[in-house]
């Protein structure tokens, strides 16, 4: 077994020009902690990185010199975020509370837009269903059925086994309003954590008073990015066309106008779809407010 590991190790070095490939799981000051074959290597970056404006992020796959503990190259990213500074996220669980805090379609659409713009799969995870009455719950799930129809996964935090399956072999983040139930969900996934609200980082191995840094952990056959939380997107970084294209259902209604923003034209196919109840009215109104911010 040991000989096999040595051979695999040597093959990897040969394939990568003498360097090893790993993933940055934590950055503290100028030390970048690279995970490789079950070990953690505190590495520094090549001096030329600064000159070339290369900033390694948590989540980056890199080539590094195992002996000198130097990161030689940052490999291409599938995506990257500025706040927090992370990369290569596969999916985001948008923890969506139905009460305390109240259900917000505006926030939900804003987070969905954020993930679409970054090429991240979004999973809507519903919490606190027991705090709303049956009639209100039915109305909310009628709305959520629309999100299912346009391609989003909607799941209850009670469906633990399905969530575990979704976590497998993926790099995930949990995001949502403060108090939406992220700690409660982690407790359900792993009762041994016994988390109090706001103690996610402590359960993952941090002291209560440590400075918050982004960190990537192994979690249920996948990886979980523990972050201070995703900020709302800065709309000025994107064009109105970017935002339009990130509303995935609009493409189902081809508009006769080239580069139509679906705001004014009377014959616009998207506007017609809203009137015909084929596009959720609240989602269209949120779209209008988002592109207004992007001007």
Model-derived regions: residue spans:
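N-terminal accessory targeting/assembly segments
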Residues: 3-103
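Short coil/loop residues immediately preceding or within conserved phosphate-binding loops
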Residues: 19, 169, 192
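Helix-rich effector regions associated with P-loop NTPase G domains
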Residues: 30, 53-62, 66-68, 75-92, ...
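General small-molecule cofactor/ligand-binding pocket signal
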Residues: 72, 153-155, 225
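Phosphate-binding glycine-rich loops and their immediate beta-loop-alpha structural context
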Residues: 99-149
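Canonical P-loop GTPase G-domain recognition
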Residues: 131-180
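Conserved active-site beta-strand-loop modules that form the wall/rim of enzyme catalytic pockets
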Residues: 171-179, 183-186, 214-216, 221-225
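A conserved segment at the C-terminal end of the G1
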Residues: 183-195
